[in-house]
Amino acid sequence: MERRRVVITGLGAITPVGLTAGESWQAVKNGVCGVAPITQFDPEGQKVTLAAEVKGFVPEDHMSRAEAKRMGRFTQMAVVAAREAMDQAGFTPAEEEKDRCGVIVSSGIGGLAITQAEHERGKARGWDRVSPFYIPTGICNMAAGQIAIATGFRGMCSCPVTACAGGTYAVGDAFHYIRDGYADVMLCGGTESAVTPLAIGGFTAMRALSESTDPNAASIPFDARRNGFVLGEGAGILLLEELDHALDRGANIIAEVVGYGATCDAYHMTAPRPDGSGGAKAMAIAIADAHITPDQVEYINTHGTSTCLNDSGETAAVKLVFGGHAKELAMSSTKSMTGHMLGAAGAVEAIFTALSLKDGFMPATINYKEPDPACDLDVVPNEGRSADLHYALSNSLGFGGHNGSVLLKKWEA
């Protein structure tokens, strides 16, 4: 089967540090921290009081009130990010093209806030008074479905629910779908909005979240002081396109997708394999998929959650794959700025990785103070760096043992 080349021609994002992909990337380049006290509910009585919320997003600025009411917040953000990606790509499909255009968008939790609200409504008013919009606005796949409705894309439409790796799986699956000839254009990525009492309470009970009250000492990947992640929210959508299709219409190409690997630890519900072997295999598969060698990779946008087990395990994984080259490459965590956006994380981080290649810039791991001997690689501490990058990986590791890695290449016409 012919291996077609796949490029990125459009980006859209809503994150804790910006309401567009461009705003978010500029904030990341500037080292802006999106962690702050929770505002979406009163966290009094909770051990965790910080989150990385999206600030200033008003859905009615982008759609009618009636449309907004028929979407959960996670879907609203995904649809707006998809429109941004389409606009940046300058792509309006002809009617006959729409069967060759598809959507793959992940969400790990979907409309959790909707579930909480409707549960309270059912208890108070009777279960037959639950909103008829509860199910279609709350289910995880509705972000993908609403994007397809908004764009008219009639090809493959899917929602990988692989926890924190979902956004990366969406990008990787879309890449393979185009590469192998099943589509010409795919909107792909992830979305999440789960800053709710139930989610905060659940993750806190697992001891997964940082209980720090200092926004600059909560999401601190690879730092010896780290003690949990900060829950974030947002959406990231990429428009992937077959190369000739993009060139024929004169599209502006941002980066090329060249490899994808996915594995499972098959080890534990939430903990990664301590030796990093599952994540290592995902990276190795992505590198082999691209027909390059490990020493050609110069930068990794890591999963880097700020949990003790993840960061040491991912460091071990990098050493397994790259050997001596691990000390030469750079790897940073933009979750130090955005928090952990769960199903949206991998998509937003793929966007940042594409822009790292385009702009020749490696973002920092901010608020880094105390080195950890178990995380002894170059984490680009505190200050981002300019670099002429050619290949970069974006990693995601999810509960359930899901590992995903996407390999991107600098676009050179």
Regions inferred by a protein language model and the residue ranges of each:
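ACP-dependent fatty acid/polyketide chain-elongation machinery
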Residues: M1-E67, A89, D244-E256, I351-T365, ...
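Condensing-enzyme catalytic core mediating Claisen C-C bond formation in acyl metabolism
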Residues: R5-T9, C33-P37, D214-A290, Y299, ...
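Conserved beta-ketoacyl condensing-enzyme motif
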Residues: I8, S24, K29-T162, T191-I200, ...
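A glycine- and small-aliphatic-rich helix-loop capping segment at beta-alpha/alpha-beta transitions
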Residues: G22-A27, A113-W127, Y177-D180, I200-T213, ...
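Active-site-proximal alpha-helical scaffold in enzymes
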Residues: A78-F91, C140-A143, A148-E192, V230-A251, ...
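Phosphate/pyrophosphate-binding loops at sites that engage ATP/ADP/AMP, CoA/4′-phosphopantetheine
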Residues: A85-E97, A246-N252, M283-Y299, V321-H325
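Glycine-/small-residue-rich "gating" segment that lines the acyl/pantetheine channel
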Residues: A124-S131, Y169-G172, H176, E192-D248, ...
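Acyl-CoA/ACP chain-elongation machinery
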Residues: Y182-N227, Y260-P274, G304-D311, E328-D378
